[in-house]
Swiss-Prot record:
HAMAP family: Glutaminase. This is Glutaminase. PANTHER family: GLUTAMINASE, GLUTAMINASE 1. The modification N6-acetyllysine is found at residue 294. Belongs to the glutaminase family. Substrate binds at residues 66, 117, 161, 168, 192, 244, 262. One of its GO terms (biological process) is glutamine catabolic process. It catalyses: L-glutamine + H2O = L-glutamate + NH4(+). GO terms for molecular function: glutaminase activity. The keyword Acetylation applies. Keywords: Acetylation, Hydrolase. NCBIfam families: Gln_ase, PRK12356.1.
Length: 310
């Protein structure tokens, strides 16, 4: 049994130590994100048996952004299976920025990873759907099943994203021309942009992690969301590419599958045990929350979790 006092102390200590850490800046290329108050910070644990521990601004709702890629990858694995995802999208780190097109050029147009923009757009196109709205509703539903029913599209974030997503539109057409997009290019880009524009809070983000930790069963609703045998593929991708250019450093120092988003959220999974999530808007140069990384790493270290430990 996990010690409730120890878990609450871990999040309290992480928050106290790092919530006012200086450094980083909000993403400024998406107008909505530039205006989120930079002093916000939160950290939370949700255990695989459904206990919740949090500190800071844990009710504040922020844009899910790239963490949505985990949810869409999960749905694609349910729809087409791990082999098809590997064949049609890839399962390798790119070693390049999340919005890079260089990896596409180097690998014949194949995006390599579902957790960078090119691969995520391709993954969105893999979802079984007859039209744009069905594709979008299925992705929204999996986000809600994994994290909580309150996860919803923000029209303000979506508008802010849709009017600035020219680079992603270009990526979508490159994928389409290379044969690695499986629906209309602008449909894939539209739905991908929407999936990044949902709002979530830190406890819900930790719930997403706890659902993965529990082998696909949401510990708060007790409903099976994913097949248990698909979860290791998701965690492997998170370990390889979840923090973009910081992924190797994160694996080396923290040793947990993770995923960040430019909205300031960051998630880590302790398989079989818990999800750990944090939020704070200022980002490092790779697009990861500066305080969020420190808070999640602190919780993991205090509790002694690292998947590479014997």
């Amino acid at each position: 049994m996990l010690d409730a006092n120890k878990l609450q102390q871990a999040v309290d200590q992480a928050y106290t130590q790092f919530h006012s850490l200086n450094g980083g800046q909000n993403a400024d290329y998406i107008p909505f994100l530039a205006n989120v108050p930079g002093q916000l910070a939160a950290v939370a644990i949700v255990t695989s048996d459904g206990n919740v521990y949090s500190a800071g601004d844990s009710d504040y709702r922020f844009a899910l952004e790239s963490i949505s890629k985990v949810c869409t990858l999960a749905l694609a694995l349910e729809d087409v299976g791990p082999q098809a995802v590997q064949d049609k999208v890839g399962a390798d780190p790119t070693g390049l920025p999340f919005n890079s097109v260089i990896a596409l050029e180097l690998h014949g147009g194949k995006p390599l990873s579902p957790l960078v923009n090119a691969g995520a757009i391709a993954t969105t196109s893999l979802i079984n759907a007859e039209n744009t709205e069905q594709r979008w509703q299925r992705i929204l539903h999996i986000q809600q099943q994994l994290a909580g029913e309150q996860v919803a599209l923000s029209d303000e974030v979506n508008q802010s994203e849709q009017t600035t997503n020219f680079h992603n539109r270009a990526i979508a057409w490159l994928l389409y021309s290379a044969g690695y997009l499986y629906c209309d290019a602008m449909e894939a880009c539209d739905v991908y942009t929407r999936q990044c524009s949902t709002l979530i809070n830190t406890i819900e983000l930790a719930t997403l992690g706890a659902t993965l930790a529990a082998g696909g069963v949401n510990p708060l609703t007790h409903k099976r969301v994913l097949q248990a045998n698909n979860v290791p593929y998701i965690l492997a991708e998170m370990m390889m590419e979840g923090l973009y250019g910081r992924s190797g450093d994160w694996a080396y120092r923290v040793g947990l599958p993770g995923k960040s988003g430019v909205g300031g959220g960051i998630l880590a999974v302790v398989p079989g045990v818990m999800g750990i999530a944090a939020f704070s808007p200022p980002l490092d140069e790779e697009g990861n929350s500066v305080r969020g990384q420190k808070m999640v790493a602190s919780v993991a270290k205090q509790l002694g979790y690292n998947v590479f430990k014997g």
